[in-house]
Amino acid sequence: MLYLSEVLLQHHDIETFEQLLEVVQTRAQSEMFFKIDVKPTYPDTPANWEDRLEGAFVGIHSVTR
């Protein structure tokens, strides 16, 4: 299972929400489940951040854009 908190700890060089989406998409290739256990604190984090992260994980591009 991929935890968002783990992604944020392991990739502390991420500076934007868009970069986070890219990392989640990459990590999704080797994981089956995704747990959103924290809220990202990037200035560009959108109101629908949970939907966009879930979309990035499952590959639904209409949600990630």
Residue positions per predicted region:
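Metal-dependent phosphodiesterase/phospholipase catalytic core, i.e.
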Residues: 1-65
